[in-house]
Amino acid sequence: MNTDDVLAVFREAGAILEGHFILTSGLRSPVFLQKARVFMHADKTEKLCKALAEKIRAADLGPIDYVVGPAIGGLIPSYETSRHLGVPSVWVERENGVFRLRRFDVPKGARVVIVEDIVTTGLSIRETIDCMKDLGIEVVAAACIVDRSAGKADVGTRLISLAAYEVPAYPADKLPPELAAIPAVKPGSRNI
């Protein structure tokens, strides 16, 4: 599965939106990938996550003990990808603004892959890595369905992406006039 195939799945689901969006990262963009419209379809989710699992397997990372998903966006793709890898899925969630592994016991030294939905700046993955390091858990790689930065985001580890789809993103004070003229909406989940 390549970038065009992934974007075709997003288009079929009506998940590529145009307008003025405030991304979870705080950046602004004329394009928003509404992955919830994809993930509401089990067949589309399975297709994408099975392909991502195959790409993770092909990366020859050695044994993987768990897949970790940052809540909220990483919950569905991490679970479905773990199913195809045949390993358990756990997640981190925010507690006072910091990712914590609250509901699971993962042993020190466990080898994990972090699976995210969409990467723009890599912040959620970096925060998940910090949480794992604090617990003595080894992050062998991160993976995502779509890398909006097309490889430019610093995620703090190797990033395996199913699709690289570079979409412009701007700080709020550096918007192009045509984007500034459109009212902004904030569909992301960072502060949930």
From Swiss-Prot:
Residues of the signal peptide: none
EC number, as in UniProt: 2.4.2.10
Sites where the protein binds 5-phospho-alpha-D-ribose 1-diphosphate: 116-124
Superkingdom of source: Bacteria
GO annotation terms (biological process): 'de novo' UMP biosynthetic process; pyrimidine nucleobase biosynthetic process
Keyword set includes Magnesium: yes
UniProt cross-references to SUPFAM superfamilies, sorted A to Z: PRTase-like (SSF53271)
PANTHER family xrefs: OROTATE PHOSPHORIBOSYLTRANSFERASE, URIDINE 5'-MONOPHOSPHATE SYNTHASE
Function of the molecule: Catalyzes the transfer of a ribosyl phosphate group from 5-phosphoribose 1-diphosphate to orotate, leading to the formation of orotidine monophosphate (OMP).
Annotated protein name in UniProt: Orotate phosphoribosyltransferase
Gene name as annotated: pyrE
